[in-house]
Swiss-Prot record:
This is N.vectensis toxin 1 3. Pfam families: Toxin_4. Residues 21-36 form a propeptide. Belongs to the sea anemone sodium channel inhibitory toxin family. Type II subfamily. Residues 1-20 form the signal peptide. It is found in: Secreted. It comes from Nematostella vectensis.
Length: 85
């Protein structure tokens, strides 16, 4: 059992080292642009009540909306908000 734990710890360290590779840093504006383009679309209240015909003008942000964005859904969620610029 002890050798199994050692193997698990070694694998965890290997994954941690592999994930800790150097990444290029982006400015906040560039990061916001890239995140907004890769985000999950959501329907704002202004898009209408029917989700099938809505234009999905919002983007789902985890946590809360970043600066320059506003919450566009009337309901409250702890996990994510539907935001648009």
């Amino acid at each position: 059992m002890a050798s199994f734990k050692i193997v698990i710890v070694c694998l965890a360290l290997l994954v941690a080292v592999a994930c800790a590779r150097r990444r290029d840093m982006m400015s906040d504006d560039e990061l916001d642009f890239h995140l907004s383009k890769r985000g999950i679309p959501c329907a704002c209240d202004s898009d209408g009540p029917d989700i099938r015909s809505a234009s999905l003008s919002g983007i789902v942000w985890m946590g809360s909306c970043p600066s320059g964005w506003k919450k566009c859904k009337s309901y409250y969620s702890i996990v994510a908000d539907c935001c648009n610029q």
